[in-house]
């Protein structure tokens, strides 16, 4: 990244959030939607614009549309903390964001033209006068961000102000009405400054969803003959069973009995549609040999996101579902529901 003559320089560690099982309550907390996108710090000084990822890596080459949008603002100095999302079919698409991470500039430009990204701003670290706000409490930074947006981006469709509230009921209502389109809720202490590289005073509550899946196969635990992971499938409209992910959260004391049960059910093909081992940008499991199973077992798993036809991360085993027919395990239970225009108070198009 280029040097930027501002009080805050890239790479700058972002303030991160601690994962919690329940949102904190109290008027000292501000609640915001947890968008399903790419965290992005945006730096501008004159004609120099840099975008930084959560991990500190440069993003500008992958989002030329965002760089151009920021250069179009009359404010010539600022640092904004934000989330990049790509609106598709009334919702947002994490898969489209992933496609931007391509080495060919021509491909990136084509993707940007087809699906421009939107920046959802939720913090202002350097204002238009070039003054650092990082040490100021969030309540003051939020007011400054709202003034900045009103003065410089009110009519800019691809720079949106993330909604915020001190009413926890309102925050939970966003989750309820937005369906699967939000990743959760973030809560921030209003009295604290921006804690770069720290998790103090900022927590995230993630939505955990569940789905019933067919066990189409399994993999052995490395170096053993005990089951290591169950391979999960869902039936598509084509009537085929497609591999959508895995769960490896099996208790050690259950592995021997479960392995014996699964071995008796070994039968190809296991998956009649998309099978394990194919390319996937979400895969975190090691590809390799797997054992196909007769399509009779149904398991309920917990997951955070389902994108691009599969679970983005490994799922958590919840329970067996002997009461559920495999044919009932379809994609409709995991498809992302797009929010209506009233679901959350920010329009992406």
Language-model region placement:
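Catalytic cores of nucleic-acid ligases and guanylyltransferases
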Residues: 1-349
């Amino acid at each position: 990244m280029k040097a930027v003559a501002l009080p805050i320089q890239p790479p700058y560690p972002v303030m991160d959030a601690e994962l919690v099982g329940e949102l904190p309550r109290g008027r000292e907390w501000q609640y915001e939607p947890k968008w399903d996108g790419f965290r992005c710090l945006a730096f501008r000084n004159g004609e120099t614009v840099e975008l930084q990822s959560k991990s500190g890596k440069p993003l500008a080459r992958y989002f030329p549309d965002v760089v151009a949008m920021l250069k179009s603002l009359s404010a010539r100095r600022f640092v904004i903390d934000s989330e990049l999302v790509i609106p598709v079919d009334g919702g947002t698409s994490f898969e489209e964001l992933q496609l931007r991470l391509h080495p060919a500039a021509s491909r990136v430009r084509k993707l940007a033209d087809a699906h421009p990204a939107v920046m959802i701003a939720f913090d202002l670290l350097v204002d238009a006068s070039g003054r650092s706000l990082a040490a100021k409490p969030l309540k003051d930074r939020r007011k400054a961000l709202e003034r900045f947006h009103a003065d410089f981006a009110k009519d800019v469709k691809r720079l949106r102000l993330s909604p915020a509230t001190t009413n926890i009921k309102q925050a939970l209502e966003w989750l309820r009405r937005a369906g699967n389109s939000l990743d959760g809720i973030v809560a921030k202490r209003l009295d604290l400054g921006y804690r770069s590289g720290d998790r103090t005073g900022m927590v995230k509550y993630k939505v955990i969803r569940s789905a019933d899946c067919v066990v189409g196969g399994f993999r052995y635990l490395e170096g053993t003959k005990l089951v290591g992971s169950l391979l999960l499938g869902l039936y598509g409209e084509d009537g085929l069973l497609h591999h959508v992910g895995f769960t490896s959260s099996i208790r050690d004391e259950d592995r021997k009995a479960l392995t014996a049960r699964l071995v008796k059910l070994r039968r190809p093909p296991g998956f009649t549609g998309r099978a394990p081992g194919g390319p996937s940008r979400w895969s975190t499991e090691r590809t390799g040999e797997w054992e196909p199973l007769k399509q009779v077992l149904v398991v309920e798993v917990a997951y955070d996101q389902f994108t691009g036809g599969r679970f983005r991360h490994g799922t958590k085993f919840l329970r067996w579902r002997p009461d559920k027919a495999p044919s009932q395990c379809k994609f409709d239970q995991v498809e992302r529901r797009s929010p209506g225009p009233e679901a959350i108070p920010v329009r992406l198009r």
